């Protein structure tokens, strides 16, 4: 799931492939959720829709502009990288967690964001599919929210850490047991 336009909702993105070397390629499917709660199949209109024998996708902000770019791994061909060129006035926030008592990459840490009456959760994972690895960062779309009231991190070590008044549109480095986040 990816916040395609830094809104608060997440839109699903799918890749297709088989667990054997296919003799043909598959269409990549892209769906966006509409206001009425139904998904719209945007595959034919989407510039990242291509035929391939793909295995997984991952989302990362390669150019540090605040929006997520897409990497699709393929079974028998090179990975494809798609830069997000969408313009948006919506806000976002990223966190890079660093464990001291927990593992250094904070894999398994859960962050809970509170902004206004909204709440979001994210878990640090190392990968989500065959031939992919994620950046060890959490990215949250905030919509029009101008600040994050708090972020609470539940570390794998069992430590719970809360930071407040987090500025949007920045990458914040949170070190386990250090009471202040570094901002980039």
Label the model's feature ranges.
Residues 1-24:
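Short, conserved, GDST-rich strand-edge loop motifs in beta-rich repeat architectures
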